[in-house]
């Protein structure tokens, strides 16, 4: 099964477009609080006032000792989370696209895809034990819901008739309905098991080891997520070229005019739009609109 780290790797390879970033290796394992780290090879560009990345954690270098190959660092730099690392882990020096930021971009993309404008979603189910008398029932375990898709009750083990005249109520008092989501019955339903099928937003991918399936993301979305990460990571890079107090990277106006970085994602935006339309069409075919009478 595909992990979050695999998606980040694919996006990073496309973003770098063949550029090889400077790397080193951690020589000795460290916990999440150690501030003196030992590297396996010559420090190279690892010097004072630079940053490097191991996994999704960024570190700021306060001091570097080229003789002992050690660096004194600030852990969890730039909003990243300090973590334990193992000897042999790769340290990327001054990464162009920090993996922690890429993970944030990935989760932002998942949230955006679930918006009504884009129309993508995952299908989830919850089974309720209904007593046949309560008019409103708490949707146990539901934390997020876009809309109801289908409601059925178990008449026999091979017969689940549709329950009609039901409504979804949101933001109900949690003192009475723990989830805040309520299924309201406007007509009689016999006691038994009621299966609720609903549309939900995609979940959050917490770490690089998280499997996409846990967030409701199928293999069909993998290329779309890679596109989203690329677009979000490149979108803000033009800003630093417009600082007025100092000159940034040398700009060859004839070859790389102002706006070139921003314009470089135009084709990606078009491809993303087409892929969203295609995925929305697939979901509409699999889960067509239903009318309850």
Can you annotate each of these PLM segments?
Residues 1-31, 42-59, 63, 67-70, ...:
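Glycine-enriched, solvent-exposed interface loops adjoining structured elements
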Residues 35-38:
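Short glycine-/aliphatic-rich beta-strand segments at the starts of folded cytosolic domains
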């Amino acid at each position: 099964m595909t992990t979050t780290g695999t998606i980040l790797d694919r996006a990073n390879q496309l973003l770098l477009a063949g550029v090889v970033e400077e790397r080193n290796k951690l020589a000795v394992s460290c916990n999440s609080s150690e501030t003196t780290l030992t590297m396996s090879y010559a420090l190279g560009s690892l010097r004072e006032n630079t940053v490097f990345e191991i996994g999704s954690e960024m570190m700021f270098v306060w001091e570097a000792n080229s003789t002992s190959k050690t660096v004194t660092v600030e852990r969890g730099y730039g909003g990243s989370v300090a973590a334990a690392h193992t000897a042999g882990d790769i340290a990327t020096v001054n990464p162009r696209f920090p993996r922690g930021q890429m993970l944030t971009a990935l989760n932002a993309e998942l949230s955006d895809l679930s918006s009504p404008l884009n129309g993508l979603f995952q299908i989830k189910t919850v089974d309720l034990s209904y007593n046949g008398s309560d008019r409103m029932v708490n949707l146990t375990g539901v934390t997020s819901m876009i809309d109801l898709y289908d409601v059925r009750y178990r008449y026999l083990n091979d017969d689940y008739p549709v329950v009609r005249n039901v409504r979804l109520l949101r933001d109900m008092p949690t003192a009475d309905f723990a989830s805040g989501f309520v299924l309201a019955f406007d007509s009689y339903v016999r006691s038994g098991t009621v299966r609720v099928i609903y549309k939900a937003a995609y979940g959050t991918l917490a770490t690089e080891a998280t499997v996409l399936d846990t967030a409701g993301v199928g293999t069909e979305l993998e290329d779309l997520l890679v596109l989203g990460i690329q677009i979000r990571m490149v979108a803000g890079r033009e800003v630093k070229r417009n600082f007025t107090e100092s000159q940034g990277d040398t700009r060859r106006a004839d070859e790389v005019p102002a706006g070139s970085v921003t314009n470089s994602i135009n084709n990606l935006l078009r491809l993303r739009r087409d892929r969203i339309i295609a995925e929305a069409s697939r979901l509409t075919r699999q889960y067509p609109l239903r009318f309850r009478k």
